[in-house]
Amino acid sequence: MKSVLAFLGSVALATVLVLAVWIGFLAAFPQIGPRIGQTPMDVWAYLVDGKPAQRAQLLDGLVITLRDAGIGFAVGMSAALGGAALALLSREFERSAVPVATLLRSIPLVTLAPILVATFGRGLTMVAITGALVVFFPAFVTIMSGLRGAPRETMDLVRAYGGSETTALRMVALPAALPSLFAALRISVPGALIGALIAEWLGTGEGLGSTMLKAIPRYDYPQLWASIAVVAAASIVAYTLVGAVERVVALRFAGPSVP
C-alpha cells in the first residue's frame, strides 16, 4: 500500500510541477496570446469536452508513439548495457568505443534523421535507430561508471577463487551498478520519447510527432498543446514507474530497511 501511495504521490507532484511551469511560461510571455498559448484548462476542455474523434486521434497517436519509444528504448538500453559490460572487460574496447559514442552524441539527431531515412526507409528500423541514438550515450556513460565503481576487493576475491572476468562482472559489478542502471533507465525514458517524436516528425509520419507537425500549419493549437500534454503525462508516468521498480529491486537486494 505504501508503494502505491508513494507512486501516486510522485505522479501528483510531477504533474503539479509541470502545470506550474506551464502556467508560469504563459504568464512570463503574454505576447504569445490566448489563441496560441493554450492553458491547462483549455487542454482539459479539448480532451474531455471535445469531439470523440479528437480524443481517438490522440489515443491512436499515443499508442504509436509509445510503441516507437519502447523500441528505441529497448535497443538503446541493450546496446548501452552490453557496451558498458564490454568496456569493463576490455580496456581496448573502451578506448575505441567511447570516442565513437562521443562523436555520435555531438552530431544533432535532426541532421542524421534524413540520412537514416534514406538508408533504412521510414519503417521501424529507422525508428529503432533514432531512439537508440538518443538513449545510448547517457545510458552507456552512466552504466559504465556504475560498473567501474564495483568493489575492487570483491572483484579480486572472485578471481582469486578461480572466477573469470565474466563471473566477476555478473556476481559483483552488475549488482553494484544497479543504482546507476536505474539512473540510466530514468534518464532514458524521456529520451526515448524524444527520439520517437523526432522519428515521427522526420520519418514515419505517424504518431503524436506527426500529429503535432500537422497541427501547426492548420493553426490547430489546441491539438498541438494537447499532444504535448499527453506526451508529458506519458513521460511522467513512465519515469515514476521506473522509480517504483527501482524501489522493489532495492527491497529485494537490501531487505525491508530500505526507506
Q: In which residue ranges do the predicted regions lie?
A:
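Transmembrane alpha-helices
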Residues: 129-133, 165-199, 225-226, 238
